[in-house]
């Protein structure tokens, strides 16, 4: 054994005495590579072995090491620019990652995203964002988006971005989960995901108004019918408000108002101060619905002068103003002789 073995001021020293065999002996010690050293630059460690005998030359064995980056580790997340897209709308996905280890290196990062059923990739929408190195591979094939990066030695965020279109055939209000796989080949793969919930398209209302008699006599009753429907397939009318102010010369027939058509029925149907009001919500079909009411032509209405009855049918985006015209006539006379 050495008669002396110590470390002082960064120098390892050992001393042996009277070795008379041919067996190998070693001293062993450990060092830690500092974070501050230059990556890829050789460090040579030279020892000096000398024997206290002028016939033995000094021996200076060396060993080299080349410091490398630490193994990196990824952090990932996935975002979508619209969590509640309408049928037929385009949305944008963003898959982002970064190395979380200072002085670490991600030798390879692979990203894969299988586009779920109900979504359709938008051609040429795939792109990468972030500092160099750019991805060595970035493509979409058969509904799968893939990217590959190599030799990332910083901690900056990089992203791949692509767009999809929500198919008209998907089920409204049923969540679609899009999950990516981001693999740094050293640690268990990350699986960031994001959820969207498809919504109906915006509906658009079409309206018309009819009267059952265009030339009523003074004192007669006539029936008005205001009809409307959604004209957009897979569209939704969230709210429809109908208002009809009964013109001068006409008088509402009490209790005559009613609604016709499939559910949903109107939440509100009333007549107040000569105004007929109806309100519908959440219409998702394209069927026709109507409100119907009667008026009586007043005796003092001017014969032969047109009375225009205009309604407002408002879907909060594209209001319509259907109208119907009547021309009051004299009552039938009766002769007395």
Each model region followed by its residue ranges:
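Exported/extracytosolic protein signature
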Residues: 1-337
